[in-house]
UniProtKB/Swiss-Prot annotation:
It is a peripheral membrane protein. The lineage of its organism: Bacteria, Pseudomonadati, Campylobacterota, Epsilonproteobacteria, Campylobacterales. Could be involved in insertion of integral membrane proteins into the membrane. This is Putative membrane protein insertion efficiency factor. It comes from the Bacteria. It comes from Helicobacter pylori (strain ATCC 700392 / 26695) (Campylobacter pylori).
Length: 117
């Protein structure tokens, strides 16, 4: 279920994050305290959330990335009515779809962890 509500705004945010990854982050030492990295966390959220909702969650994640936080594994979460096959495409040689993300229910079963395959 790709975010189609505001594709232009999502595309701008996605392009800016990819630019950051390619031109700035690639030339600095790896120092992220979390998995997935904050920029990947942002890209994954932009696939599932509206851009404004995603920006709020991304801001909280970036603010928690400081020396006083222990870090660790922190997957983004989203609310969906039902899980679906996300960002699939047909392989040119075979007639099957490739799974890009797994949606794993949290303990509350109201939200899902977004895990990239």
């Amino acid at each position: 279920m790709r975010n189609n509500k505001t594709p232009f705004l999502s595309a701008i945010f996605t392009a800016s994050i990819r630019g950051y990854q390619r031109f700035f982050s690639a030339f600095t030492p790896s120092s992220c305290r979390f998995y997935p990295t904050c920029s990947n966390y942002a890209l994954w959220l932009l696939c599932f959330e509206s851009p404004l909702s995603a920006m709020g969650k991304i801001a909280i994640r970036i603010l928690s990335c400081n020396p006083f936080c222990s870090g660790g594994i922190a997957y983004p979460t989203t609310r969906l009515k039902r899980p679906s096959l996300i960002q699939s495409h047909k392989d040119s040689n075979r007639n099957f779809k490739t799974i890009t993300f797994w949606l794993v229910p949290t303990k509350s079963h109201a939200t899902y962890y977004i895990i990239k395959v």
